[in-house]
């Protein structure tokens, strides 16, 4: 393992971190909405998103790097921001869903603009599956 990461390694690591961050955020916001007795599908989306963690850990290892986790303090601050958004929103569920959509958009942009798929057909399939998951989550959250 080299000290300097290749672009592919950096992209794969960032995708893994965003997968974990979005799943954790969905779960935390789901708990917040559940505490308010608001119906939502955030836990189901988080569960499905978490299925990609092991897959992308494998991609990172395949590229010769070691997987890492997101910054816990940053995740905590983002969760506080989500809770504040929900607290001051006229429609708490919609506000939280919009926050989730914003986070997914960042992940979707990275999934659609990286060059990881050029390394192997297996990595390309994993990226396509994650992209399908992101589109499905967007459809659920935006009510399409």
Q: What spans do the regions from the language model cover?
A:
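Conserved alpha-helical segments that form or flank metal/cofactor-binding pockets of metalloenzymes
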Residues: 40-75, 137-144
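Structural signal for well-ordered, non-membrane alpha-helices
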Residues: 20-23, 27, 50-57, 108, ...
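Alpha-helical scaffold segments that form or flank carboxylate-/histidine-based iron centers
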Residues: 7-15, 34-55, 93-96, 121-136
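Alpha-helical bundle segments that constitute or directly flank the non-heme di-iron/ferroxidase center
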Residues: 2-33, 93-118
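Long, non-catalytic architectural segments outside compact domain cores
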Residues: 8, 14, 21, 28, ...
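Preference for long, well-ordered alpha-helical segments
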Residues: 96, 103-144
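Long, hydrophobic, amphipathic alpha-helical segments used as structural scaffolds
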Residues: 34, 57-60, 64, 92, ...
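Carboxylate-rich helix-loop segments that flank metal/cofactor sites and access channels
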Residues: 58-98, 102, 106
């Amino acid at each position: 393992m080299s000290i300097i990461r290749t672009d592919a390694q950096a992209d794969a690591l960032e995708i893994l971190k965003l997968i974990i961050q979005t799943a954790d955020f969905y779960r935390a916001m789901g708990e917040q909405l559940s505490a308010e007795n608001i119906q939502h599908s955030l836990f189901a989306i988080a569960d499905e998103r978490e299925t990609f963690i092991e897959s992308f850990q494998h991609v990172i290892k395949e590229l010769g790097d070691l997987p890492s986790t997101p910054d816990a303090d940053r995740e905590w601050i983002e969760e506080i921001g989500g809770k504040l958004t929900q607290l001051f929103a006229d429609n708490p569920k919609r506000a939280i869903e919009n926050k989730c959509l914003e986070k997914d958009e960042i992940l979707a942009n990275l999934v659609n603009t990286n060059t990881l798929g050029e390394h192997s057909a297996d990595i390309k399939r994993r990226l396509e599956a994650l992209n399908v998951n992101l589109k499905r989550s967007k459809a659920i959250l935006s009510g399409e």
